[in-house]
């Protein structure tokens, strides 16, 4: 299955609308995410490794905000515990439809994967050993994030983990500027124009709300996790593991 090149913001837009995961984005998503998020491929592959370590026999693994299912496929390829399954959730019908097509191409279906089109805030989390929020929490209204993490913590087995990847913010203006400028340089190096960078930033401004690492660690502790550890960071993108 071929994927198109992202050119959604290549031409000047008459009217800027908030970013959404519609059919246009789905068609170019693999290209968009690889060219926009530094270290994305490494994050995906290592989520598979972490999931393999902490998946427990007879449990569920959740991929919340699964988009096209890259995390689910990475977990599926690594998990060896018996009677595990993966529940992948996204609220975009277009994402789920394309994700199911990609899932069907996987030639080694060792772990069952169920892709569900639903609001992840309304999906029951139960008997879980691994839960992944890979660049998902940042799209949840900040006031609702703690409640979601509390539900995840409650649904995890003892010894289970939450893997949380996010675009992050920095409290000091100098550090914020440092990381933002390098991220923009990364996107330019991957072929995005200044117009594309500017227009996408405007489209995401009210939709994607990043927070500091300290904020994430504090919220995870408040949700009941015993500890959280930063395992990956490249510029203003990071991933943490939180242990129950």
Swiss-Prot record:
Homodimer. It catalyses: prephenate + S-adenosyl-L-methionine = carboxy-S-adenosyl-L-methionine + 3-phenylpyruvate + H2O. Signal peptide: none annotated. Belongs to the class I-like SAM-binding methyltransferase superfamily. Cx-SAM synthase family. This is Carboxy-S-adenosyl-L-methionine synthase. Catalyzes the conversion of S-adenosyl-L-methionine (SAM) to carboxy-S-adenosyl-L-methionine (Cx-SAM). Pfam families: Methyltransf_25. S-adenosyl-L-methionine binds at residues 40, 65-67, 90-91, 119-120, 134, 201. InterPro entries: CmoA, Methyltransf_25, SAM-dependent_MTases_sf. Keywords: S-adenosyl-L-methionine, Transferase. One of its GO terms (biological process) is tRNA wobble uridine modification. It comes from the Bacteria. SUPFAM superfamilies: S-adenosyl-L-methionine-dependent methyltransferases. The gene is cmoA. Its EC number is 2.1.3.-. One of its GO terms (molecular function) is S-adenosyl-L-methionine binding.
């Amino acid at each position: 299955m071929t994927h198109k090149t992202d050119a959604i913001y290549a031409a000047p837009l008459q009217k800027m609308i908030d970013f959404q995961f519609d059919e246009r984005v789905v068609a170019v998503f693999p290209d968009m995410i690889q060219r926009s998020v530094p270290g994305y491929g490494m994050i995906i592959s290592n989520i598979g490794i972490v999931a393999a370590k902490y998946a427990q026999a007879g449990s569920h693994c959740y991929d919340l905000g699964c988009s096209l299912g890259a995390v689910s496929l990475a977990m599926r390829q690594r998990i060896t515990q018996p009677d595990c399954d993966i529940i992948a959730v996204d609220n975009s019908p277009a994402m789920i439809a394309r994700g199911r097509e990609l899932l069907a191409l996987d030639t080694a279906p060792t772990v069952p994967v169920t892709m569900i089109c639903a609001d992840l805030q309304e999906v029951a989390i139960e008997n879980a050993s691994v839960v992944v929020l890979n660049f998902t929490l940042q799209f949840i209204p900040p006031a609702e994030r703690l409640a979601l993490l509390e539900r995840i913590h409650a649904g995890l087995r003892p010894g289970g983990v939450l893997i949380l990847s996010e675009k992050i913010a920095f409290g000091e203006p100098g550090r914020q500027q440092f990381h933002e400028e390098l991220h923009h340089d990364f996107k330019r190096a991957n072929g995005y124009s200044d117009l594309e960078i500017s227009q996408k930033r405007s489209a995401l401004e009210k939709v994607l709300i990043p927070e500091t690492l300290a904020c994430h660690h504090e919220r995870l502790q408040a949700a009941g996790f015993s500890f959280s550890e930063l395992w990956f960071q490249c510029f203003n993108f990071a991933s943490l593991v939180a242990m129950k």
